[in-house]
Amino acid sequence: HLTADIDPLGRPRPGLPELDPAFYDLTEEDMDRVFSTDTIEGPQSMSLRQIIRRLHNTYCRSIGVQFMHMDDLLVRQWLQVRMEGCENRIQLDRKQQLRIYRQMTTAAVFEEFIQKRFLGSKSFSLEGSESLIPLVEMAIERGASQDIQDVVMAMAHRGRLNVLANIMRKSPQRIFREFADLDPELHVGRGDVKYHLGHSTDYVAENGR
């Protein structure tokens, strides 16, 4: 995770000697030698070059993962199998890609509107983390396919308004009225800041559940 490509500015970072094969006296001649890969998800044996490529694709691209400090071996193995099995990439068809694109665009437009329309108001923007919206919806859809009927969400301030609007289907009009202090209920006994308010909705998944 220390070498994962997660810096959008691409700033240079010092190398880690222990991640260089030469640190273990391995040379270019060793790259095509075949090794047992019992501790890596996938084929039972691979060349050193394939092992390095697979681990790099899994742990050193745009997703960084730090989990080896966990005490529970079964949890570590569970994570390892699921990440290394697909190299931390899921295959999305064009329909899914377009859906994610629309969700992220909607999330970004929502944040931009609030920032421009309610200048100076605290909103704990989701800006920079818009991928949370398709991720949460994907989790809910997956749950629906596993016969889960109820989902209860509890989250911190950051991104909460966006989740209320784009996941919980809370009316943006209602959210904006709350920002403008036009909702009379906010002044009758239960007043609270906008990013503390919740919502309940009936979510219909793609499978109709």
Model-predicted regions and their roles:
Residues 1-132, 148, 185:
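Extended, charge-enriched "interface" segments that sit outside catalytic cores
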Residues 4, 8, 21-22, 107-108, ...:
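A sequence-composition feature that detects small, non-aromatic residues
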Residues 47, 51, 96, 100, ...:
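Generic hydrophobic, aliphatic-rich segments that mediate packing or membrane embedding
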Residues 97-111, 132-145, 186-205:
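Structured alpha-helical segments in the cores of large, soluble enzyme domains
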Residues 113-173:
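Active-site pocket-lining segments that scaffold enzyme catalytic pockets across diverse folds
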Residues 152-209:
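Cofactor-binding active-site loop characterized by glycine-rich and histidine/acidic residues
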